[in-house]
Amino acid sequence: MVLHEVINEFLELDGDDYDVVKISEVKGSRIIKYISSYFVGTLKKVEYIPEKLHKHAGFIIRNMMNIVMGNVGIDVGYCNKLFNNIARWFLGFQKFIEKHNLPEKYFKEYYYAAFSGLFILIFGKIKNFKLYDTIVRLWIIVDNIFGFGIDFGEKGLIWKKGVYDFFVGGAFENREKRLEFLEKSGGGPIIECFRNIERIGLSEKKKDGLYLRFYKLFKFAYEGGGGGEGGSESGGEFEILKNSCLKTKKGLDIFFYAIDYKKKKEDAYKIFHLSLIVQLLDDLMDIRKDKLEGKTTIFTGGVEENTRNAVRLFQLIQNSRIIRDNSFQILYECLMFLIIDLNEEFFEPEFVGKIRRECPVMDLKYYNMREIDSVVESEIMKKILCIYLK
């Protein structure tokens, strides 16, 4: 019962009864649920919309999103700016994939990673959109090179050595060495990301801090082929959860460079709390993959245990001091329900049924991860994004 022990560090709650799951109501819940019944279906029909109607279609899509965001209490003006940038990121990353001949599956990874990173908006708004985009790109490429280098073959080994030399060789520590390394290095997606960081306009002090945090993250996650400080899979369930949370926390530390926020010592508790929630949602999302690969997380147990742990995670989201009474709480809840609906066979049927019946802002029959996945194919998504930007 590792999760039960960890959550009791924060809450005095008993998470064994899934009847405690009371999904948040928000203003306009009925309208949002109505929209959710049509939203994905509308997107799937985008490819049949004549070009002369693209501008009108873009207005409809944007308006649907604004209604949802406005009703959950999020600044619609900022969301418009944010989604405009997200659309440009996705289109830019598609070109990045083509330029470096990367696997198409990375587009979907980028899509989910970019949205997952938005959890940090609880602390402040994104102020450097180019940096945020570069951080997501760099993380995806490095994660795949170190974790699944087979996708790249010999090129992957060269890129992996480039990252190793850059950080372990100390090129990141001062500007002269850094620029010299970039000049001598060949191409490749990682070097392009490093070059983007150099061009973004950060002060040298901020660049040094950013590179240092990347170094700490990569070292923690991958030293010793994943079995080093951050890859401890032999220390039992608690150690796995602890190390996963620390890895997530180190990742969030990097995203702080892209948002309007000055880190304070007293926020350390909040940051760890958010890291725990983000990591647990990630484990929840990866149940099927983790089981196939023989990994152990708190969601790779039996159906009853998974259900209890899902209820505890829900309680953690609803009672977290950092998320409670925040506009983003309903979005966290919705993400969790989408994931549980997708992985229904790993939970008690009564629990899944309760979520499907009672969620006030989503009709999970129509708006679910299977349908969303069917839309997040690069060509369809590319057209949707172009229409949205019109």
Segments from the language model and where they lie:
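Divalent-cation-assisted or electrostatically stabilized phosphate/pyrophosphate-binding catalytic cores
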Residues: 160-198, 233-247, 291-322
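Charge-biased, low-complexity intrinsically disordered regions
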Residues: 15, 40-42, 54-62, 295, ...
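Acidic, carboxylate-rich catalytic segments that either coordinate divalent cations
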Residues: 3-7, 344-390
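All-alpha helical catalytic cores of prenyl diphosphate-utilizing isoprenoid enzymes
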Residues: 82-140, 144-148, 181-291, 330-334, ...
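C-terminal structured domain segments
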Residues: 307-368
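An N-terminal, globular interaction/scaffold subdomain
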Residues: 41-105
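Intrinsically disordered, low-structural-confidence terminal and linker regions
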Residues: 1-38
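Extended intrinsically disordered, low-complexity coil regions enriched in Ser, Thr, Gly, Ala
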Residues: 152, 156-161, 285-291
